[in-house]
Regions:
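Patatin-like phospholipase
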Residues: 1-36, 44-282
Length: 282
């Protein structure tokens, strides 16, 4: 059983989009896909088999003022850096149609990670095949300070990366004996507390366990990477890691930079395809 784990990283995740399209071209379809934040948001087009859709999303939509920007964050009806209705409703349902029928026919399982605001713990949810407003994907992408809390079944959730940034262990628990893990940070990256971390901790002080998860994220991330790389060295997982992200940051919208990062991911996967197939056949 093949698992595919997709780290988040907002615009940096365009690297993963190139890899996913290369996998689709070579008919490498995972039985279990799990994504965090943008990893899940882009991963759904892998599950629907729509090669090139993520590239169009990145280069034609993400850089527009309609898609994201500070003005959306201060809009009391939106309260998010991204235009929520446009990104999760208008784009997939009108301007860049998502193939719901193909997704319904996907034989694998697709999960997203979210963090429960009440207790700071990770929850792993199947991405519905009939939610045309993508509420779960909004939740897994809900970065602290940049998104409102997203309600699902009466509970409030935010970005899955806070509690489980690289959920490959969940794929193993699901029964995957072969695992592809796609990272979006360069090899050797060590996470440190971001400048906004202290502000986020204060902002969410009414939810102390959630604030604690934010405070300890860097330490847990680095431990996870170290353990993952041990498994890679033992040949138990196949890991894609970019050597560079070409200066693409979290909210990058420059279509030239995004295309360059996508192409890099695509070419990386094609270059590694023989080794990947050997791993899958072991």
């Amino acid at each position: 059983m093949l698992g595919l784990t997709l780290e988040g990283g907002a615009s940096r995740t365009v690297y993963s989009c190139g890899i996913m399209d290369a996998l689709l071209e070579d008919k490498i379809i995972a039985d279990y896909v799990i994504g965090v934040s943008a990893g899940a948001a882009f991963g759904v087009s892998y599950c629907s088999g729509q090669i090139g859709r993520n590239l169009r999303l990145a280069t034609e939509f993400m850089g527009t003022k309609k898609y994201m920007g500070a003005r959306h964050l201060i809009d009391p009806k939106n309260r998010c850096y991204y235009n929520l209705d446009y990104a999760y409703n208008v784009v997939p349902n009108v301007e860049l149609p998502f193939d719901y029928e193909a997704y319904r026919n996907f034989k694998g399982r697709f999960c997203a990670v979210v963090t429960n605001v009440k207790n700071g713990k990770a929850e792993y949810m199947d991405v519905p095949k009939d939610d045309t407003h993508w509420n779960l994907l909004r939740a897994t992408c809900a970065l602290p300070l940049l998104f409102p809390e997203i309600e699902i079944n009466g509970e409030k959730y935010m970005d899955g990366g806070i509690s489980d940034s690289i959920p490959y262990l969940q794929a193993i628990k699901a029964g995957c004996d072969k695992n592809i893990v796609v990272l979006t940070r360069p090899k050797g990256y060590v996470k440190t507390q971001e400048p906004a971390t202290k502000l986020a901790i204060k902002y969410y002080h009414k939810h102390p366990e959630f604030a604690e998860a934010i405070a300890t994220r860097a330490e847990r991330y680095n431990k996870c990477i170290a353990e993952l790389m041990e498994l890679k060295a033992e040949g138990k997982v196949f890991v894609f890691t970019p050597k560079t992200t070409f200066g693409v940051g979290r909210t990058e919208g420059d279509p030239v930079k995004l295309r360059k990062l996508y192409d890099y991911g695509y070419n990386h996967a094609k270059w590694a395809m023989d080794d990947l197939k050997k791993y899958l056949c072991k």
